[in-house]
Amino acid sequence: MHTILINKLMSLKQRFYKLEKSLNNFNTINNKEFYSLSKEHTYLHEIIKYFEEWLNIQKNIVHTKDMLSDIDMHDIVQDELKILNTSKHNLENKIKILLFSDPQDQYNCFIELRAGTGGKEAAIFAGELFRMYSRYIEMQRWNMEIIHATYGECGGYKEIIIKVPVHGSYGQLKFESGGHRVQRIPNTESQGRIHTSTCTIAVIPNIPNAILPEINSNDLRIDTFRSSGAGGQHVNTTDSAIRITHIPSGLSVECQDERSQHKNKSKALSVLKSRLYAINIKQKQQEESNVRRNLIGTGDRSDRIRTYNFQQGRVTDHRIAFTSYKLHDIMNGKLDILIQPIMCKHQATLLDQLTREK
């Protein structure tokens, strides 16, 4: 582990025990301060627990290495060192994940997929990305629900919004936000020409209602209409589908998944609130640091983050110049092939920033 990071953790350890002392003397602090200190203490608790385990293992490694000179014990000591080093490495990964996590990483999320340029082919591509995420979610043993879907004329989706109600799913999937581009020969192409189509993804944290700001009802316009299925046919005889527009920002959300107008309204409002919250958070982050903007992207749908080239069987993530030739596996849900490298790069970038600040 980098010396700068160890020094940072030593500093956090001192802070953690100082917090414990203050919280034990709760009569000397008011309720608001107690809540704030408790929140910080909870955040540091797991980090310090793993760090203290790491320090103990580090001591054991030094002590065990001293025994290598004993010829009779050499093989046993080597095996013990392998076990200790594996444990040490695992703890370092856990510490980095906790230390460099975003406060919103703990939340579940919405994934919005929208077909971009490319017409019918873009909608088909959006459908394939939806299948990719569905398979990934299934592999993680998570669950999901469709909030809203507008079907493409030849299959796929013009737009689809899904909810992944699993703790920490936002932190796992947030790097998917941005523009996804596909290069391939469509089935409808008779001359064998490669076409380029795009789909935009937005991964939004589903913030608990207790944290979300209230929206003035006068700022909302609510429209009702009949739900429609693939091909545009109406699948409901009542106006159960809902469209909510936030007038000041111009943001709008549709929901037609439920037969109940009340349930559709509740779901649409939840998505709208999360979108507005995400925009506010993004603005603050852009003011504070370039790290997120450079690596995760601005969240702007025009950011091209990834290209899927079917002719060459490759996927390239442009943010970290990473290319994999396992396109088939990725499209079948093995998304960790792409997620893990960018998460590692993100941690390395934050550590580098920490070093420069030091």
From Swiss-Prot:
Cited PROSITE patterns: RF_PROK_I
Subcellular location, record wording: Cytoplasm
InterPro entries given in the database record: PCRF, Pep_chain_release_fac_I, Pep_chain_release_fac_I_sf, Prokaryotic/Mito_RF, RF-1
Post-translational modification: Methylated by PrmC. Methylation increases the termination efficiency of RF1.
GO molecular function, one term: translation release factor activity, codon specific
UniProt-listed HAMAP family: Rel_fac_1 (MF_00093)
Family named by the database record: Belongs to the prokaryotic/mitochondrial release factor family.
Name of the protein this chain belongs to: Peptide chain release factor 1
Lineage: Bacteria, Pseudomonadati, Pseudomonadota, Gammaproteobacteria, Enterobacterales
Gene designation per UniProt: prfA
